[in-house]
């Protein structure tokens, strides 16, 4: 997909008329899944004005999850053109895939790395996230296609691979690398893998997966220094490596906006606190979507954007709001992970320990449920579901998705949910 490189005025002056309050020109900052889906949704809901898309990597939009899940089996990115049929060249009037935004000015006006100054009625910030790499660390990260190529080149049978962090990415790469014959050690500072995401009680049940997959997991192992040849722990021990991967999280790519937007619109990790339609409060003509947006959910409260499902579904909410189209029900956060020979599907936002368990961890499929007080039609013995983790239960994913993405809270029959002989869909009610 070629990137246009003209310097004509943007947007042109001969734009079609639009109803009051509806933009005639839009700049989408970001050419990943959220940006591509935003362009698609705008056109699908009738936007006929001038559309500009700005990217950073110089590549057409691609899906990021396969970078880790299929690191050694997929040699090139999964292009969204092939996967979802998204062709930016046919959707947008201008596509600049290697000219990222560097500043946002009132108007709004977007300044780019090449020196362009692009004005528009609406700017949609879909600029994604960046992997966390603490100052002084010398390690690979995995976020882009270029990162994946470097990591793929460094992994080899018998080679020593040290992964710092046992979160989603760390676990997936540990399994892939061990399966390819690498000598894998995973260093996790917390008391269990995925402790921040699922809690220590649930994470403890994932510990045996590492040894079964051929990887060493070392808990309570905080990294003090990270170099290309290994990791020095806080205890002073040195863990040698041929490849070191830092998998300690990601943060919204909003650093370039700090001087442009008021401080109160940022949450503690740098996401933008938007309304249900993605609008940034107090900043006319600016909306945000995907990893950079923290949006309200009618059941879950504030939902951070660092989920693949946010990049896939939330652009539709933003486009509808921008164009004055009737809103659709909000999607709940969803994460799918294939790690260490197991499938995990997480819906919602877990907090604390699960209220209900289904099945027995370590003995076939199992699930954990996080609930709150029943409301809006709840009955005795039921509760509102705030999160569900399904482990090796692909047949239940559809039922949980339907319950979470309905018009109101999902209710769980607590007794039926704990009984694995009862179909899960019969324990859930939207």
What do these predicted regions represent?
Residues 83-95, 206-217:
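Helical element adjacent to the flavin cofactor pocket in flavoenzyme catalytic cores
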Residues 1-27, 86, 90-160, 234, ...:
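FAD-binding core/adjacent interface of flavoenzyme oxidoreductases
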Residues 160, 169-223, 331-336:
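Rossmann-like dinucleotide-binding cores of NAD(P)H-dependent redox enzymes
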Residues 9, 21-25, 294-398:
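Mid-to-C-terminal Rossmann-like scaffold of FAD/NAD(P)H-dependent oxidoreductases
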Residues 237-268, 342-430:
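C-terminal catalytic lobe of FAD-dependent flavoproteins
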Residues 12-93, 176-197, 399:
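Beta1-alpha1 glycine-rich phosphate/pyrophosphate-binding loop at the start
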Residues 137-159, 230-232, 238-311:
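FAD-site-proximal beta/loop scaffold in flavoenzymes
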Residues 32-33, 58, 131, 146, ...:
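Residue-level detector of alpha-helix initiation sites
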């Amino acid at each position: 997909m070629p990137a246009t490189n003209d310097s004509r005025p943007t947007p042109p002056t001969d734009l079609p008329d639009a109803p009051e309050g509806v933009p005639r020109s839009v700049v989408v900052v970001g050419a990943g899944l959220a940006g591509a889906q935003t362009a698609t949704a705008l056109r699908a809901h009738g936007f006929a004005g001038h559309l500009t898309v700005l990217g950073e990597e110089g590549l057409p939009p691609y899906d990021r999850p396969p970078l880790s899940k299929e690191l050694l089996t997929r040699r090139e990115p999964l292009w969204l053109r092939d996967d979802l049929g998204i062709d930016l060249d046919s959707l947008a009037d201008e596509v600049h895939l290697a000219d990222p935004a560097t500043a946002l000015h009132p108007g709004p006006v977007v300044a780019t790395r090449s020196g362009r100054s692009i004005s528009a009625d609406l700017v949609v910030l879909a600029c994604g996230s960046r992997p966390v790499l603490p100052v002084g660390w010398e390690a690979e990260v995995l976020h882009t296609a270029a990162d994946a190529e470097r990591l793929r080149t460094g992994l080899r049978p018998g080679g020593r691979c040290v992964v710092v962090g046992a979160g989603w990415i760390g676990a997936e790469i540990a399994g892939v690398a061990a399966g390819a014959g690498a000598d894998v050690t995973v260093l996790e500072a917390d008391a269990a893998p995925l402790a921040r995401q699922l809690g220590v009680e649930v994470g403890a049940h994932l510990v045996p997966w590492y040894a079964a997959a051929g990887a060493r997991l070392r808990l309570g192992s905080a990294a003090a220094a990270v170099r290309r040849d290994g990791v020095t722990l806080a205890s002073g021990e040195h863990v040698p490596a041929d490849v070191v991967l830092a998998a300690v999280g990601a943060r919204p790519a909003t650093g370039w906006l700090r001087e442009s937007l008021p401080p109160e619109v940022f949450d503690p990790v740098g996401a933008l606190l938007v309304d249900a339609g993605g609008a940034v409060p107090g900043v006319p003509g600016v909306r945000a979507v995907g990893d950079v947006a923290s949006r309200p959910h009618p059941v879950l409260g504030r939902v951070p954007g660092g989920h693949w499902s946010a990049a896939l579904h939330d652009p539709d909410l933003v486009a509808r709001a921008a164009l004055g189209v009737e809103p659709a029900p909000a999607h709940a956060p969803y994460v799918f992970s294939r790690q260490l020979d197991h499938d995990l599907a997480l819906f919602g936002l877990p907090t604390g320990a699960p209220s209900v368990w289904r099945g027995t961890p370590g003995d076939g499929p199992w699930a954990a449920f996080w609930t709150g007080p029943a409301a809006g039609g709840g009955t005795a013995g039921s509760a509102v579901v705030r999160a569900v983790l399904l482990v090796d239960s692909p047949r239940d994913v559809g039922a949980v998705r339907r319950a979470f993405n309905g018009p109101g809270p999902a209710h769980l029959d607590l007794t039926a949910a704990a009984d694995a002989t009862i179909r899960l869909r019969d324990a859930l009610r939207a």
